[in-house]
C-alpha cells in the first residue's frame, strides 16, 4: 500500500505523541515493589478483576501459615448485581484463629481487606463476627460485615489500612469471636502493596487542631483510611490513581445543607505543575484539576459556610489531609482568595491562601491536620467547614478545596477497630469503603523503566496497528453486535475517559448506596424478564403509565425485588423515550433518583428494570387512596428529597438535565419513605453556558406544565421548578393538579392555590387532616416557596437550590417550634403572609437584602442565630443535633 509523504509525517507525529503520553503516564505513577492480590477461596487458576489486576488463589498458597484444614473454601451462595466476581465470589471461612503470612520487605504497606457478606458453606452471614490483627495492631474487632453492609446499604466492603512492616514478615490473623458459639470469620480478598512513606510526620510541624502541641506520625503509627474524596470532581477508580490503587469518591453526598457551592475545573490552558519536593503520586492530576468553591456572590458567601460532615468512630484521633490547587486563571496573587478552615468547629487555618502557599495557580499543595474529637461512644460527626476571611479584604470572598483524605490513627494500645454501625435511619453511608467502577479507562500499573524507549516505541506501534486494524474492520463492516441471548453487563459510556472526564461531574450522591455500579447497565434476556414477572402476570401490575404497564418482579433467584416497566407498542412514548431513559439513568446515581438496573430489547420489546419502590408513588398517599394520611413532617421530608433529586439534575451532572415531567406520580417512595424522582423518558439536556434555553416541542403533563414553556416552546430548568411548585401545593392541599369536577376557577391547582394565597385564604384549602398540625412559621415559609415556584415568568422563579434551602428551613421551623413546645394553629394567619407580586430575589441576587434560607447552625454559618429561644451557635445546644436542624434525608436505605 502506497503511503503519501503527508500521511507518513502524520503517522510519525502520532507515534511521537503516543510515546510522549506513555512516558508522562509512567512518570506520574508509583511502581510498587511488592503487589500481592490474594483471591481467598478461589480456584487454582489466576483471575483478572475489572481493573485488569491479576489475583492469585490462596488454595495451597505459600501465604497460608495455618493449616488449610483449619479453614474451608466456599463460593458465595448468591451474587448481588453490583458485586464483581473477583475477588468476591469465593471466600475462606475460619471457625478458629487462622493466620496468613506474607514475606515482604520492611516498610510501609497498604493492606486492603475485601468482604462480601453472604452465605458461605451453608453458614448464616449474620453469625460472622471476628477480629483481625497484625502484630501489635488490632485492625478489626467484633467485626460484622453483615451488619456493616446492612447499616450502610453496601453490597460489599473494603477496609484499607496503612501499616509498617518490620522484620520482613507480615502476619495477619483472623479470629472468630467467642460468642456466639457459632461465630466464624471469613475474607474474600487480601491485598498487600508496598507504598511510599507519604503520611508520616516526625519534624514537629504537625499540630493538633485547637492545641499548640505537635503530633508525631512515625513507623509505630497505623492508619485506617475512612474517607478519600475528589472534591468537585468525579469518582476516580483505583486503576486511574497514581499506581497506589486508591479509590477517590465524589464529595457531594457529604455536603451539609443546601449550600453545595459550585464545582470548578482548571482552565483548559492550565497545566497542573507539581512543585519540587512533591511527588506526583501524592494525588492524581484529576484531583488537583477539579475543586469546589462557594460561588461568585460575596454577599451569599459571607453568610454561610461550605461544610462537609463525616461519620467517624469515637475514641480515636484522626489525620485530615486537605488537597489544594488554585484552578482559576484569574487568581494569581496573594490575598485574592483567602478563607478560614474549621475542623469540628475549631479553627484549623485562620488565613488559608493557596497562592501564598504555592506562589502560582495550577500548583498542587496539601496540608495535614490532626483532630481529636470529643469523647463519646459509638459514632459521631466530624465537621469540615470553609468560610471567606474578610479581615484583609481579599479580592474574592470565597474558598476552595480540591481533595480530602481522612485517616483513623491507632490508639496507644494499637487498636484501630471501631464499633459496628447500627442499622437505622440515622446511619450515614460511607462510600469510601465501596469500590465503584468509573468511566475511566484502566491504565497500566507497571512503570516503564527509565531508558526503555524501545519499549515505548513497541507499545506505540502495537497501539497504532490495533487502531489501524480496528479501522479496517469497521470499514469492512466486520464488527458484530454482542449476543443478547443471555444476561450480561453492557458498559454505557458516561462522559468520556481518563483525564478528559475530570471535569465531567458525575454524582453518585447517595449513589454510594445504590445497588449497581455507576457506569454499568445490565442487559436482560426476554426469558429472564418473563421469569421475573411470572409471564407478565396481571396480578403483579403495580401501575400503568404513558409508556406502558409496570410489574413487580424478582430477579437473581428471587433475591432482588424490582419494578419492570414494559413498553406498550401502541403508546405514544416509544423508542426515543426508551433510549432517553437508559441514557439518562445509566449516567446518574443519586440517593433521590430511582436506580435503573437494566433493560431488555429482545423481540422488539422495550423493557426497563428499576429498583423496587415499596411504597409506590407520592400521589398514592395524598388523595383518592385507602392509605393513611401522611403526617406533615413526612410530607415535607418527601418534598425535600424530591427537591434534592431535581437539584442534582440541574446542577450536579456534567450538563443541566431538565426532567420535563415532574409530578407526584413520578416521585416514588422506597421502603424507608425516601423520595426518588423517576421517569426520565421526557428528560432533556439543558442549555449550555452560552444559551439560556432549549427550543423544543412542548411535552409534559397537563396541570403541571409551565405556561411560559407552553407559550414560547423554550425549555429551561425553571420549567421543572414550576411543576414542582404544583407538587408542593398537592402535598399541602391533598388534591389533584387538575380536578374537572370542581368549579371552573378551581379546576387547576396551579391557578386556584395562588389565587387563594393572594386573597389570604390559602389555609382554607389545606388538607383537613393537616389542620392544627402545621406551625404558622412553617406554613408561611412553605406557602411562600410554593407560590414563587409557580410564578408566571421563569426568571422570577427561584432555582431548585433555593427551593431546597427554603424547604429545609420550613422543616427546621416546624421542628424547632415542636421541640420548644410552641403550639400549632388550625387557622394560619394569612394576613401575615404578604404577597410580593413576584418580585422575589434569589440568593444569587446581589441586590437582595435578605438571604432566603441562610439559617444553619454555627458549623455551616458565618453568623450566630437562634430560633425559638435556642441558640444554634453553641456546640452543646440542648441536644439540637444537625439532623434536628436540617433534615438531610440521609437514610442509608435510600438506595
Swiss-Prot record:
Gene3D superfamilies assigned: Galactose-binding lectin, Phosphorylase Kinase, domain 1, Transferase(Phosphotransferase) domain 1
Signal peptide: 1-27
SMART domains: S_TKc
Post-translational note: Autophosphorylated. Phosphorylated at Ser-858, Ser-871 and Ser-874 upon activation by RALF1.
A Gene Ontology BP annotation from the UniProt entry: root development
Documented EC number(s): 2.7.11.1
Biased composition (Polar residues): 884-895
Listed transmembrane segments: 448-468
Top-rank taxon, per record: Eukaryota
UniProt catalytic activity: L-seryl-[protein] + ATP = O-phospho-L-seryl-[protein] + ADP + H(+); L-threonyl-[protein] + ATP = O-phospho-L-threonyl-[protein] + ADP + H(+)
Phosphoserine found at: 858, 866, 871, 874
Location of the Protein kinase domain: 536-810
Effect of residue 565 to R: Loss of kinase activity
Residues carrying sugar: 46, 124, 142, 171, 219, 269, 305, 330, 345, 410
Induction: By brassinosteroids (BR).
Principal location class: membrane
EC primary class: transferase
Residues annotated as catalytic: 661
Region Disordered, annotated ranges: 844-895
Keywords: Abscisic acid signaling pathway, ATP-binding, Brassinosteroid signaling pathway, Cell membrane, Developmental protein, Ethylene signaling pathway, Fertilization, Glycoprotein, Kinase, Membrane, Nucleotide-binding, Phosphoprotein, Receptor, Serine/threonine-protein kinase, Signal, Transferase, Transmembrane, Transmembrane helix
Its membrane topology: Single-pass type I membrane protein
Disruption phenotype: Embryonic lethality due to impaired fertilization. The pollen tube fails to arrest and continues to grow inside the female gametophyte. Disturbed MLO7 relocalization to the filiform apparatus upon pollen tube arrival at the micropyle. Severe cell elongation defect in RNAi mutants with decreased FER expression. In fer-2 seedlings, altered responsiveness to brassinosteroids but increased ethylene response during the regulation of hypocotyl elongation. Increased resistance to powdery mildew (e.g. Golovinomyces orontii). Abscisic acid- (ABA)- hypersensitive response. Longer roots.
Function: Receptor-like protein kinase that mediates the female control of male gamete delivery during fertilization, including growth cessation of compatible pollen tubes ensuring a reproductive isolation barriers, by regulating MLO7 subcellular polarization upon pollen tube perception in the female gametophyte synergids. Required for cell elongation during vegetative growth, mostly in a brassinosteroids- (BR-) independent manner. Acts as an upstream regulator for the Rac/Rop-signaling pathway that controls ROS-mediated root hair development.
Protein name (record): Receptor-like protein kinase FERONIA
Amino acid at each position: 500500500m502506497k503511503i503519501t509523504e503527508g500521511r507518513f509525517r502524520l503517522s510519525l507525529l502520532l507515534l511521537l505523541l503516543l510515546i510522549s503520553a506513555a512516558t508522562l503516564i509512567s512518570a506520574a505513577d508509583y511502581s510498587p515493589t511488592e503487589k500481592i492480590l490474594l483471591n481467598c477461596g478461589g480456584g487454582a487458576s489466576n483471575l483478572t478483576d475489572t481493573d485488569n489486576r491479576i489475583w492469585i488463589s490462596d488454595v495451597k498458597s505459600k501465604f497460608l501459615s495455618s493449616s488449610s484444614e483449619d479453614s474451608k473454601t466456599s463460593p458465595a451462595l448468591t451474587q448481588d448485581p453490583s458485586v464483581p466476581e473477583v475477588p468476591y465470589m469465593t471466600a475462606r471461612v475460619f471457625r478458629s484463629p487462622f493466620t496468613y503470612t506474607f514475606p515482604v520487605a520492611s516498610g510501609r504497606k497498604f493492606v486492603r481487606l475485601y468482604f462480601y457478606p453472604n452465605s458461605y458453606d451453608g453458614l448464616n452471614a449474620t453469625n460472622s463476627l471476628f477480629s483481625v490483627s497484625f502484630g501489635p495492631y488490632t485492625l478489626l474487632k467484633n467485626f460484622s460485615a453483615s451488619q456493616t453492609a446492612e447499616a450502610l446499604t453496601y453490597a460489599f466492603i473494603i477496609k484499607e489500612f496503612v501499616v509498617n512492616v518490620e522484620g520482613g514478615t507480615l502476619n495477619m490473623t483472623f479470629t472468630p469471636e467467642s460468642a456466639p458459639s457459632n461465630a466464624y470469620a471469613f475474607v474474600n480478598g487480601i491485598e498487600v502493596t508496598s507504598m511510599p512513606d507519604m503520611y508520616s510526620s516526625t519534624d514537629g510541624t504537625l499540630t493538633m487542631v485547637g492545641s499548640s502541641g505537635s503530633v508525631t506520625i512515625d513507623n509505630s503509627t497505623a492508619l485506617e483510611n475512612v474517607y478519600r474524596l475528589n472534591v468537585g470532581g468525579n469518582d476516580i477508580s483505583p486503576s486511574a490513581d497514581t499506581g497506589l490503587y486508591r479509590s477517590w469518591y465524589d464529595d457531594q453526598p457529604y455536603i451539609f445543607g443546601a449550600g453545595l457551592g459550585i464545582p470548578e475545573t482548571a482552565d483548559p490552558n492550565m497545566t497542573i505543575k507539581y512543585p519540587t519536593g512533591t511527588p506526583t503520586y501524592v494525588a492524581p492530576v484529576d484531583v488537583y484539576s477539579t475543586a469546589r468553591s462557594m460561588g461568585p456572590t460575596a454577599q451569599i458567601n459571607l453568610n454561610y459556610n461550605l461544610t462537609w460532615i463525616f461519620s467517624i468512630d469515637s475514641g480515636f484521633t484522626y489525620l485530615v489531609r486537605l488537597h489544594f490547587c488554585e484552578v482559576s486563571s484569574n487568581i494569581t496573587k496573594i490575598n485574592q482568595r483567602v478563607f478560614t478552615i474549621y475542623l469540628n468547629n475549631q479553627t484549623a487555618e485562620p488565613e488559608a491562601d493557596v497562592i501564598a502557599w504555592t506562589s502560582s495557580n495550577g500548583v498542587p499543595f496539601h496540608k495535614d491536620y490532626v483532630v481529636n474529637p470529643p469523647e463519646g461512644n459509638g459514632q459521631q460527626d466530624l465537621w469540615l467547614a470553609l468560610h471567606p476571611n474578610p479581615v484583609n479584604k481579599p479580592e474574592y470572598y470565597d474558598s476552595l478545596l480540591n481533595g480530602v483524605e481522612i485517616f483513623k490513627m491507632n490508639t496507644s494500645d494499637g487498636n484501630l477497630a471501631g464499633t459496628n454501625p447500627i442499622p437505622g435511619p440515622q446511619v450515614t453511608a460511607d462510600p469510601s469503603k465501596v469500590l465503584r467502577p468509573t468511566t475511566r479507562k484502566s491504565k497500566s500499573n507497571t512503570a516503564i523503566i527509565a531508558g526503555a524507549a524501545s519499549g515505548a516505541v513497541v507499545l506505540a506501534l502495537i497501539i497504532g496497528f490495533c487502531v489501524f486494524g480496528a479501522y479496517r474492520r469497521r470499514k469492512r463492516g466486520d464488527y458484530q453486535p454482542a449476543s443478547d441471548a443471555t444476561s450480561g453487563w453492557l458498559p454505557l459510556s458516561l462522559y468520556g475517559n481518563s483525564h478528559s472526564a475530570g471535569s465531567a461531574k458525575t454524582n453518585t450522591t447517595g449513589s454510594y448506596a445504590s445497588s449497581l455500579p455507576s457506569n454499568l447497565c445490565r442487559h436482560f434476556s426476554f426469558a429472564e424478564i418473563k421469569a421475573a414477572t411470572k409471564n407478565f402476570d396481571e396480578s403483579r401490575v403495580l401501575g400503568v403509565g404513558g409508556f406502558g404497564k409496570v410489574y413487580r418482579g424478582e430477579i437473581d433467584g428471587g433475591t432482588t425485588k424490582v419494578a419492570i416497566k414494559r413498553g406498550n407498542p401502541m403508546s405514544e412514548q416509544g423508542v426515543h423515550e426508551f433510549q432517553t431513559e437508559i441514557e439518562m439513568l445509566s449516567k446518574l446515581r443519586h440517593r433521590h433518583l430511582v436506580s435503573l438496573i437494566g433493560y431488555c430489547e429482545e423481540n422488539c420489546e422495550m423493557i426497563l428494570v428499576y429498583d423496587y419502590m415499596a411504597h409506590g408513588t407520592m400521589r398514592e398517599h395524598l388523595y383518592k387512596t385507602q392509605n393513611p394520611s401522611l403526617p406533615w413532617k413526612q410530607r415535607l421530608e418527601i418534598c425535600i428529597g424530591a427537591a434534592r433529586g431535581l437539584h442534582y439534575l440541574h446542577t450536579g451532572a456534567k450538563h443541566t438535565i431538565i426532567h420535563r415531567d415532574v409530578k407526584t406520580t413520578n416521585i416514588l417512595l422506597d421502603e424507608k419513605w425516601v423520595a426518588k424522582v423517576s421517569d426520565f423518558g421526557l428528560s432533556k439536556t439543558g442549555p449550555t453556558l452560552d444559551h439560556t434555553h432549549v427550543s423544543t416541542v412542548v411535552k409534559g403533563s397537563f396541570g403541571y406544565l409551565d405556561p411560559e414553556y407552553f407559550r414560547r416552546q423554550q425549555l429551561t430548568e425553571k420549567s421543572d421548578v414550576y411543576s414542582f411548585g404544583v407538587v408542593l401545593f398537592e402535598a399541602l392541599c391533598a388534591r389533584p393538579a387538575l380536578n374537572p369536577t370542581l368549579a371552573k376557577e378551581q379546576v387547576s391547582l396551579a391557578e386556584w392555590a395562588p389565587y387563594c394565597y393572594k386573597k389570604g385564604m390559602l389555609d382554607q384549602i389545606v388538607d383537613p387532616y393537616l389542620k392544627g398540625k402545621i406551625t404558622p412559621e412553617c406554613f408561611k415559609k412553605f406557602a411562600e416557596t410554593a407560590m414563587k415556584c409557580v410564578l408566571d415568568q421563569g426568571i422570577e422563579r427561584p432555582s431548585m437550590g433555593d427551593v431546597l434551602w427554603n424547604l429545609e428551613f420550613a422543616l427546621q421551623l416546624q421542628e424547632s417550634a415542636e421541640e420548644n413546645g410552641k403550639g400549632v394553629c388550625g387557622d394560619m394567619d394569612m394576613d401575615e403572609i404578604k404577597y410580593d407580586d413576584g418580585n422575589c430575589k434569589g440568593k444569587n441576587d446581589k441586590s437582595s437584602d435578605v438571604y432566603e434560607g441562610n439559617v444553619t447552625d454555627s458549623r455551616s454559618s458565618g453568623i450566630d442565630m437562634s430560633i425559638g429561644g435556642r441558640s444554634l451557635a453553641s456546640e452543646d445546644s440542648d441536644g439540637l443535633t444537625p439532623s434536628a436542624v436540617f433534615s438531610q434525608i440521609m437514610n442509608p436505605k435510600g438506595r
